[in-house]
C-alpha cells in the first residue's frame, strides 16, 4: 500500500498566493502525492509545474456552496479540464437534496461527469449538513450519476470527515465507487481512522505531517 497515493495535497483558501501554491507543488513532488488540489484559478499554473511529474492536478467545482447552476458547474468543469485539471471535485446542490429534488441532484452530478469527459469526478456531499438518511441518499445519487468518488466535505461548512460517515458512505456505494475523506484530517491517527473506515483518498492540507507520521511509525 502506497500511503502517499492516498493523499490529495490541498490548498483551497481564498487568500492562497502563488508562493503558497509553489510550496504545496514542491511538497507533492517530494512525497509523490496523488494530486494537488487547488482552486480553478491556479489549475493552469499547477499543471505546467507538474507536467514532468506523476502528481495529478485536482480542482473544485461549484465550490464551496454547491449552489451554482448546473450549467455553470458544467462550464467550470470544461474550463478546468482545458486548463490541465486531471480530477474534478464538485459540490452537490445541497438544498435540492434537502428538498427531496433528487432528480435535480443527480442531473447536476451527471452534467459534471459528462463535462469531465472521462476524468475522475469526486462528489462532495457536505456530510456535516446532512442527517443519516441524507448521507445515504446523496451517496446513492453519486453512484447512479456515474461519478468515481463520493467525498465528505468542503472544509468550509464548520465540520469535516468522521470515520462513521466514511463507513456509511462506503457501505452505501459498495465496490463500484470510492470514498474520499476531507476536512479535519490532520495527522496519522486521523488518516488511519479514515482508511480503516473505507476511504481510499484523503484530502488534506496536512499531507506532509501525515507522511512524516507514517515515516516515523514502526509499522510503515
UniProtKB/Swiss-Prot annotation:
Domain of life: Bacteria
InterPro entries assigned: Aldolase_TIM (IPR013785), DeoC (IPR011343), DeoC/FbaB/LacD_aldolase (IPR002915), DeoC_typeI (IPR028581)
Predominant location: cytoplasm
Active-site residues, as the UniProt record annotates them: 89 (proton donor/acceptor), 151 (schiff-base intermediate with acetaldehyde), 180 (proton donor/acceptor)
Catalytic activity: 2-deoxy-D-ribose 5-phosphate = D-glyceraldehyde 3-phosphate + acetaldehyde
Biological process per Gene Ontology, one example term: carbohydrate catabolic process
Molecular-function GO terms, alphabetical: deoxyribose-phosphate aldolase activity
Pathway, per record: Carbohydrate degradation; 2-deoxy-D-ribose 1-phosphate degradation; D-glyceraldehyde 3-phosphate and acetaldehyde from 2-deoxy-alpha-D-ribose 1-phosphate: step 2/2
Subcellular location field: Cytoplasm
Keyword match Isomerase: no
CC terms in the record's Gene Ontology section: cytoplasm
Pfam families documented for this protein: DeoC
Cytoplasm keyword on record: yes
Enzyme nomenclature, EC number: 4.1.2.4
Protein keywords: Cytoplasm, Lyase, Schiff base
NCBIfam families: deoC
Function: Catalyzes a reversible aldol reaction between acetaldehyde and D-glyceraldehyde 3-phosphate to generate 2-deoxy-D-ribose 5-phosphate.
Family per similarity comment: Belongs to the DeoC/FbaB aldolase family. DeoC type 1 subfamily.
Name of the protein described by the UniProt record: Deoxyribose-phosphate aldolase 1
Record organism: Staphylococcus aureus (strain Mu50 / ATCC 700699)
Underlying gene: deoC1
